[in-house]
Amino acid sequence: MDSQRNLLVIALLFVSFMIWQAWEQDKNPQPQAQQTTQTTTTAAGSAADQGVPASGQGKLISVKTDVLDLTINTRGGDVEQALLPAYPKELNSTQPFQLLETSPQFIYQAQSGLTGRDGPDNPANGPRPLYNVEKDAYVLAEGQNELQVPMTYTDAAGNTFTKTFVLKRGDYAVNVNYNVQNAGEKPLEISTFGQLKQSITLPPHLDTGSSNFALHTFRGAAYSTPDEKYEKYKFDTIADNENLNISSKGGWVAMLQQYFATAWIPHNDGTNNFYTANLGNGIAAIGYKSQPVLVQPGQTGAMNSTLWVGPEIQDKMAAVAPHLDLTVDYGWLWFISQPLFKLLKWIHSFVGNWGFSIIIITFIVRGIMYPLTKTQYTSMAKMRMLQPKIQAMRERLGDDKQRISQEMMALYKAEKVNPLGGCFPLLIQMPIFLALYYMLMGSVELRQAPFALWIHDLSAQDPYYILPILMGVTMFFIQKMSPTTVTDPMQQKIMTFMPVIFTVFFLWFPSGLVLYYIVSNLVTIIQQQLIYRGLEKRGLHSREKKKS
């Protein structure tokens, strides 16, 4: 099997992968907002069951740290807006990226509170609590490492509920602490809940990548339990009222999108009910509700949870909750993508440029795979040397396919040639290529990361398509330099147009991935020449001899 036929095999595998990726995206299209007005069916016992209403009619307060800019509604204490000052909305933009939003076009909120029989967020006890705050704006001052935002509410029975947001410098994890003071004569039965709700359909101003099959990533809900470390839950599944309803001791619930996530992490010794819910009007929710605790008369009860609202930074997320870092979705090749990213990050700590880091890691990967590459070309050279014998065999045996197959296998065995030896190394390279693709699409560190010249964002496609064209040129040179025994006219035509086909495919791929492929091709050309010279010295003619 020669190099061009191997390239054809890899091309077919690659195209198959992209078709599968597009099919996964389109087979269950997201329901439109106007189509999701059916009656809401939710998990039994969930906060959504109890009808956590929209906040409304409260005062909006501002809470700012060096990395978070939150807007909290005093009606219920929900986070209705979250801006991330360290992450621009767009390249060269002065506007921060907005993760949580409350507008007529789009809803994405982090709700939380106290429910249960005596909880102030239980609709049976009246409207959601209207908390009192000392001021309208809280700002983390210079030299200050922690910012506390206390909110208090006293019900008609004189019971006092305090909800305190605790934010730390440089941290995207927000602790939410509750204190319940029982002023009555009967125990209070209280449960905590945390809920994330979001519009299923993105408005046009936020839908910037779903039309590009090469840049499509998962957007939806997810959860983790001790038994299931990481499970995704699609919005369209929630819209169909096929809802989650499980009990878990520990774990978390989350909503994910490319590079960013929100998550509620409950902190208690009991079990929690994890649920999803179709809230109607095109809004999906995922949340948790804790087991009720009793606060005795004259006593104070303390409960707490953590809200992650920010970028998917793996090491920081892992420190907040077990397996929260798995929300950095590297797909089914995570076991390759994760070590690749760790190596890339380590290289970046020295060179300071993600583009040059990709170039270096390409040399490392190709160096590690050099023995396989050498085996590939050696096997191809041996196969080429056998072609005259195989051709004579075909002429001698005619149409007796069984005899031809038997004698060919005997010939391969006698000459110690593996007919698949040229294909196997290429098959090994395919998972690495796909793992790098997942890594580039899932690592927030590479978002808006510049390289050089006109490449200002390695996670986005080349705006001028120069890199894909260069990639096609390198493929063309590899094809011309490689030996071929392809005689089938159709295969010859396919191979002729393969660089063009790949160039068109790569027009929409992240620049970092195209850069990897260009450097990989250049290294292949160098390795190819070195291996060919060694084979010629051994009498293995890997290429056509020039006619004198």
Swiss-Prot record:
It is found in: Cell inner membrane. Belongs to the OXA1/ALB3/YidC family. Type 1 subfamily. Keywords: Cell inner membrane, Cell membrane, Chaperone, Membrane, Protein transport, Transmembrane, Transmembrane helix, Transport. InterPro entries: Membr_insert_YidC, Membr_insert_YidC_N, YidC/ALB3/OXA1/COX18, YidC/Oxa/ALB_C, YidC_ALB_C, YidC_periplasmic_sf. Interacts with the Sec translocase complex via SecD. Specifically interacts with transmembrane segments of nascent integral membrane proteins during membrane integration. It holds the Pfam family YidC_periplas. It is a multi-pass membrane protein. The lineage of its organism: Bacteria, Pseudomonadati, Pseudomonadota, Gammaproteobacteria, Enterobacterales. PANTHER family: CYTOCHROME C OXIDASE ASSEMBLY PROTEIN COX18, MITOCHONDRIAL, OXA1. Residues 28-55 are annotated as: Disordered. It comes from Shigella boydii serotype 18 (strain CDC 3083-94 / BS512). Signal peptide: none annotated. This is Membrane protein insertase YidC.
